[in-house]
């Protein structure tokens, strides 16, 4: 989904931990000249893959009823690669969006629109927070007129005591990738195919932030 100066991966990057999503949805996307599994190029306005989950009834991970990969576009729209789920129109839902190098975000309670569709705009207000007294706890970052995800989180492992956090391990991810160009890397935090000091700035600006979305 990145700039077309190098072959981009065919399929999504969420097969490993902590997602362990083994469905091969999206394997047909990619650079058709370089990836034998790819049969069609990414749409020109696609930025990257995200991982989307829906929780029904409450915000606990055990309430997850739907998991799927999606493509995020330059305007922020996410298109899902799975068929829609079926459920009761009167229940409440939480939508979780994860990206391989950002802190995850989860919606506040939302319901089906007209009993038929589920949507949520994360750009208009801060996302779900547990509400601890810890000052470093965050949902999203207010940037200009929009609320956005916190970048610089290259290590996605969940810690039961600290939740998802930006720390020195994320700096290590950048350190390992620093100096590489034209590659699809976790440490390329601004996703311009050039892992350099500007990516380190993402980590520096967001280091220490935590969120406690139940895993």
Identify the role of each PLM range.
Residues 56-60, 100-103, 178-180, 207-209:
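Acidic glycine-/aspartate-rich tracts in secreted/extracellular proteins
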Residues 52, 72-83, 199:
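Glycine-centered loop-to-beta-strand initiation motif
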Residues 44, 78-93, 100-101:
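Short Pro-Gly-centered beta-turn/loop motif in secreted/extracellular proteins
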Residues 49-55, 94-96:
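Beta-strand signatures of extracellular beta-sandwich domains
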Residues 58-77:
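Short, acidic Ser/Thr/Gly-rich low-complexity loop/linker segments typical of extracellular
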Residues 1-43:
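Short amphipathic, basic-aromatic surface patches that mediate peripheral association
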Residues 139, 146, 156-183, 192-215:
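Alpha-helical segments with a strong preference for the paired helices of cellulosomal dockerin domains
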Residues 99-112:
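Short acidic/polar inter-strand loop motif in beta-rich domains
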């Amino acid at each position: 989904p990145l700039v077309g100066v190098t072959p981009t991966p065919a399929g999504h990057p969420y097969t490993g931990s902590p997602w362990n999503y083994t469905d091969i949805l999206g394997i047909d996307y990619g650079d058709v000249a370089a990836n034998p599994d790819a049969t069609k190029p990414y749409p020109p306005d696609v930025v990257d893959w995200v991982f989307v989950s829906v929780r029904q009834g409450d915000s606990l991970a055990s309430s997850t009823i739907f998991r799927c990969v999606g493509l995020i576009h330059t305007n922020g729209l996410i298109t899902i690669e799975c068929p829609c789920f079926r459920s009761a129109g009167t229940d409440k839902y939480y939508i979780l969006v994860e990206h391989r190098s950002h802190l995850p975000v989860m919606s506040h309670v939302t319901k089906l629109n007209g009993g038929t569709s589920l949507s949520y705009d994360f750009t208009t207000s801060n996302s779900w927070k547990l509400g601890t007294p810890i000052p470093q706890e965050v949902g999203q970052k207010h940037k200009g007129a929009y609320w956005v995800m916190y970048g610089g989180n290259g290590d996605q492992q969940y810690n039961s005591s600290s939740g998802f956090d930006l720390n020195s391990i994320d700096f290590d991810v950048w350190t390992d990738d620093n100096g590489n160009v034209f590659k699809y890397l976790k440490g390329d935090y601004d996703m311009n195919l050039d892992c350099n000091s500007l990516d380190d700035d993402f980590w520096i600006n967001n280091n220490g932030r935590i969120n406690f979305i139940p895993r």
